[in-house]
Amino acid sequence: MKAVGLVTEYNPFHNGHLYHLNKAMELTGADISVAVMSGDFVQRGELAVLDKYTRAMALNSGVNLVVELPVNYAVSSAESFAAGALKVLNYIKADSIAFGSESGDIERLSKLAHILCDNEDTLYNEISKYTANGISYAAARQKTVEKLTDKDTAAMLTSSNNILAVEYLKAIIKNNYAIKPYTIKRKGDSYNDTDIRSDYASATALRGNLKADNISKYIPVKAGLILSSNTNYIYPDDITEALFTRLLGILFASSYDKNVFIENVMRYPDVNKEIAGRLYKSAMDMITRTVPQGAESKDNGAFSFGSLCEHIKTKEVPLSRIKRALVRITLGLDKKHMEKYANEPYIRVLGFDKKGQEYLSYIRKTVEVPLITKIADYKEMLLDDIHAANIYNMIVAGKYGVKEFGDFVRGPVRV
């Protein structure tokens, strides 16, 4: 059986995802589709709008098998996110991967990926020089890549899907994976569009309009039914209390000493000394109920996750990195946790249909890592994912007053 891999978040599943799925099957001639999906936290450094099991119901729209991208990869840079997804696809024996891109040109994307792989030291050194002089990371990368290639090629890295596409290709090149890449030109609105402009609305715009009457036009029928029957939507600022509690815990463990606090939070990816210092001041302000200047919520003047991220971001460390850093702090996922999957890889199954079940049986004897459908025997291995799910479920329960069943109770979705 030939499997095509899709790296997804389905946050929520919409017309563009269905187009991507159908086009992937058509281009690759695959027998089944395998979606590697972020769990309850997503790459932009936010809570998913619905829990991972509900989002795994993309199975009703034609996906055959959904497996979880471990949380340490799900809330990391584009490079680590892509590397983690390709590891999972390699372990699950995917023959190909199909990803969206603004370019739609696999040859140009592959050429750029090879250049970046061949010049990693130069990239790191040049970008470091630029950022040290106050240039933003994005601008520094753009200038460096332009030196190595040309203006038009470097311009591809200004688009979100192109960036991820290149990272998928880099992961394949570096690891010599036997996974054939295909790209599908993105259709409809831009990834970051907050307004709905076409039938292919962005997930960003849809999350902001989940309760609008006309949203069904932009979501496949079966996905729309699931979305309308699960209205306990979660938004980025819903993590505020959990983050606040975590920061207080770090303050307490640091005996309220600034230097010790800074040392403790610098153990997390993307937290440098300047960011750590800003976090310390903000955390101390919270204790006295003094909202950090510039960190007031637009809604009620109170401290919030989003406003704090805006407050502590710098030119060198953009907002997306700050959000991921604060989510990782909330979840307790420091730099050491990134090594965990490399040492103890696994495939965590979230759901499957009949074809997906057949594929699991097909690969079970040859797969080289644990293929997990029941977590009881793999608690230690899955600890980070379980912890992330528990925090997410506590947030849902606190907001809506409903009991959410955790990973120990819920098994894979079957359709």
Regions found by a protein language model. Name each.
Residues 21-22, 56, 86:
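Generic structural signal for well-ordered alpha-helices
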Residues 1-52:
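N-terminal catalytic cores of NTP/NDP-binding nucleotidyl/phosphoryl-transfer enzymes
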